[in-house]
A protein has these predicted regions:
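N-terminal signal peptide
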Residues: 1-6, 12-41
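Short linear motifs in intrinsically disordered/low-complexity regions
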Residues: 8, 21, 170-171, 176, ...
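Substrate-binding and catalytic surfaces of secreted/luminal carbohydrate-active proteins
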Residues: 26-94, 98, 203-205, 240-257, ...
Length: 507
């Protein structure tokens, strides 16, 4: 789960457009475009006085649909209204049908991570620009994220490695305390985000490593497992450490919905890993949950209702982790779900992660396209939520003490007091803006097997239908959408090359 920014390279042209459009009497600010390298590389520029907004769906008449389109050439959430009309026998049209009677998983939400790097970059902006950035993610005129991930202590996207208790053999955690980074770069912006969402933001926390003195390696950076026997003091203390963290954040006004046991536990087998990691196998994580973490959470006021997620690693590991952990009834009673990463698809939730692309690329469409493809495939296979990595990064793709620079949906240029919304930001919004928590995926059938296009459909808690379509072709594609409840009628949507569309209509 991740993303970041790009180097402020010389651009061929810089074009700024500032438009206001009126929708039902409300002025909506459109994308202020800036081109980089080539005309297909487009970002939307925001600063202290201006930031683009997303027009609301509004009041739709019977048979009307609001259609939002974003494409490679700079169109961003362009809203039009179309209607269901009688079906025809036209050729060259892609036919598909949805059926809201056939329902699958319920959606938890979409979001990103409140890393130190994100907080440092948000903090580098003026108050007005900072507010516009947070509104872009969490506000009603933004893409309305409903999930936030919070690292427990440091990650590589910190300026240094730190823990909450560096006192060896402190098995009572009497020296536990949050770090300056929590108070400067995490908690203030988490609380603002919670307020912007009206309190619906679900937060989950994840550790990258226990303090070094608890590990076999003796240090946070690099792999290593918890020291001692599985029933020993290090395992007990580490379980209590989660509770201490939850209590400390609650005392500062932040309540958590969920928790993962360990970020990328398999990486902890590598002692030479370049940043914080800690090893669990499926068996050792199972035993840690049932013997220590589960009971510790269950008996605490802050942890008894926590949604605990296992694995938090590459999806290729999923079958064995589910089999080993969830077949054990004692462990399974504490587990609410499974967290997976998408790195093994070679398109991680933080694109720009491969050695040859360790940097942001301003305006790059291909990375947004990879996001859209992965999200559609995940949602089509029972995934209930999708969380990105860093909310924002600087032009270099950091800060990151391990120099593991990547890309992000928003790139911050602190010198200019502005930030750039990447195509990835808008791709995320085509899902997060229109699929609220509690929505259910519904049946979507293509009459002809999709080639270079795909889609996924939902019904919201207010019974609106939401359809997302992705065109990965280099040519336009026209879709004819039928719904079982609207027999004999179809909605036509034409998608330009390299584009995504979200259609919303009433029951």
């Amino acid at each position: 789960m991740c993303k970041t920014a790009t180097d402020c390279r010389v651009f061929v042209s810089q074009v700024l457009f500032q438009w206001n459009i009126s929708l039902s009497g409300i002025k909506i600010q459109k994308c202020q475009q800036r081109y980089y390298e080539k005309k297909e590389n487009v970002v939307c520029v925001c600063n202290a006085t201006y930031c683009d907004e997303i027009p609301e769906v509004g009041n739709l008449q019977p048979l009307q649909a609001a259609i939002y389109q974003t494409d490679q050439y700079g169109k961003r959430f362009e809203r039009t209204v179309s209607s269901f009309t009688e079906t025809t026998n036209e050729t060259g049209i892609i036919r598909l049908k949805i059926d809201s009677r056939i329902r699958f998983q319920t959606i938890i939400g979409f979001g990103g991570a409140f890393t130190d790097a994100a907080g440092i970059n948000i903090n580098s902006l003026s108050e007005s620009t900072r507010t516009n950035l947070l509104k872009s993610y969490f506000g009603s005129t933004g893409i309305q994220y409903t999930i936030g991930r919070v690292p427990i202590a440091s990650t590589d996207f910190s300026t240094h490695a730190y823990s909450y208790d560096d006192s060896p053999n402190d098995f009572t955690l009497s020296n536990f305390s949050l770090a300056d980074e929590d108070f400067k770069f995490k908690i203030p912006y988490i609380k603002q985000a919670v307020n912007l969402t009206g309190g619906v933001l679900k937060l989950f926390a994840s550790p990258w490593s226990a303090p070094g003195w608890m590990k076999t390696s003796g240090q946070m950076i690099g792999g290593g497992a918890l020291r001692g026997l599985s029933n020993g003091p290090y395992h007990v203390t580490w379980a209590n450490h989660y509770v201490k963290f939850l209590e400390a954040y609650k005392n500062n006004g932040v309540i958590f919905w969920g928790l993962t046991v360990q970020n990328e536990p398999v990486a902890g087998a590598d002692l030479s890993y370049k940043w914080q990691a800690m090893y669990f196998s499926p068996k050792t994580e199972r035993d840690f949950i049932k013997n220590h973490l589960g009971p510790a959470l269950r008996k605490s006021n802050v942890g008894r209702n926590i949604s605990l997620m296992i694995m938090d690693d590459q999806r290729t590991q999923l079958p064995i982790w589910a089999d080993v952990v969830l077949k054990d009834k004692e462990a399974a009673q504490y587990v609410s779900g499974i967290a997976v990463h998408w790195y093994n698809d070679f398109v991680p939730a933080c694109t720009g992660f491969k050695p040859f692309e360790h940097r942001p690329i301003l305006g790059d469409w291909s990375r947004g396209d990879m996001y859209a493809h992965d999200i559609i495939q995940d949602l089509s296979h029972w995934v209930s939520g999708w969380t990105d990595w860093n909310l924002c990064l600087d032009l270099k793709g950091g800060p990151n003490f391990a120099k593991n620079y990547v890309d992000a949906p928003i790139i911050v240029n602190a010198t200019a007091d502005e930030f750039y919304k990447q195509p990835m930001f808008y791709i995320m919004g085509h899902f997060s803006k229109f699929i609220p928590p509690g929505s259910a995926r519904i049946e979507l059938h293509f009459y002809v097997k999709p080639i270079s296009y795909e889609g996924v459909a939902f019904v919201t808690p207010t019974y609106q239908r939401v359809l997302i379509l992705l065109n990965r072709n280099n040519k336009s594609v026209t879709f004819s959408i039928e719904e079982r409840a609207k027999d004999g009628l179809a909605l036509r949507i034409k998608l330009k090359p390299k584009s995504i569309a979200t259609a919303v209509w009433n029951k």
